[in-house]
Curated annotation (Swiss-Prot):
Gene that produces this protein: YIM1
Disruption phenotype: Displays sensitivity to DNA damaging agents.
Source organism: Saccharomyces cerevisiae (strain ATCC 204508 / S288c)
Classification of source organism: Eukaryota, Fungi, Dikarya, Ascomycota, Saccharomycotina
Compartments in which it is found: Lipid droplet; Mitochondrion
Additional note from the record: Present with 6540 molecules/cell in log phase SD medium.
Taxonomic superkingdom: Eukaryota
Protein name, entry field: Protein YIM1
Pfam families: ADH_N (PF08240), ADH_zinc_N_2 (PF13602)
Any one cellular-component term (Gene Ontology): lipid droplet
Amino acid sequence: MSDEIVTNKSVTYVNNTTPVTITSSELDLRSCYQDDEVVIEVHAAALNPIDFITHQLCNSYIFGKYPKTYSRDYSGVIIKAGKDVDNRWKVGDKVNGMYSHIYGERGTLTHYLILNPAKDVPITHMVEVPKDENDPYDDFVYAAAWPLTFGTAFSTLYDFKKDWTSDSKVLVIGASTSVSYAFVHIAKNYFNIGTVVGICSKNSIERNKKLGYDYLVPYDEGSIVENVKKLKQSVLENDKFDMIFDSVGNHDFFPVIDQFLKPKAKNSFYVTIAGNNKADYKNISWRDFVSLSSILKAINPFKKYNWRFGHPYPPNNFIEVGNEMIKKGTYKPPIDSVYEFDQYKEAIDRLMSNRAKGKVVVKMK
């Protein structure tokens, strides 16, 4: 077999009745790409909840019977480039990004990813992550770990509210998630938001103190609402929040939202990326994300506050912001665990366990 003909292995599924498996196909590197495309040899890909959520919601009658590939985040090296590709992208370049798809035959949990760098954005050149001598992970692992979560957090802060100041206050429900990790770093180091309050378990408070939260409230020691109310009254001068950001799925504050969120006229927002209830990743249904209450909150013209479902696919400019913050050392992608390609099932199980503190990454090389 010619060196230009390779076996491309990918982690795929067909629908919600079929398991995740490794499928193989023959790829001719001389002809598998168009003139405006590049071929990336993937070194690492990160898992995100959207991967197994879309898998479990994939009805064969609606979404077809073709193999669908896992994952969106990636890092790797360009090994082929079409003649019409912008010369910014050259063979040998180390790149990372987010390949956006829902039920695509192409995904990033694969050995070779073919994409159009002018259309399949965001894509960027990898930057070196500041590391100490005991750091166990290489730059490819870190580069794959941040695009989707960082971009989701950035778009939440950038899209909905433009007038952040040192007097602004934000409440984060689910302070320990990877999106919230990015959120607090962006809020404090890029938008210079004055006060960020996080809600997490009592066992996670010490860890999260180091991330930049100004105050932390445990959800497993009494009422969340009452604990936040006490904090607001005792140290925030009873001032309300400019934004409540929910990254886990919660509805506790809705009955008393006017006590915590500033009036709608002041451009305040309640933003969720997880719906109104914490999802059971092993038993997901459309109702977890498209509930009647969510629809009513979105379209009700009489509600007294701005409610939005956060963007799963963020604006392209976030990738450069992330690069700059990484180079400055103001954001370092959090890694929970790293698995080899043939350990993909263990990697998925780890993320589905809800115990991961940081990103779960799969290495191809």
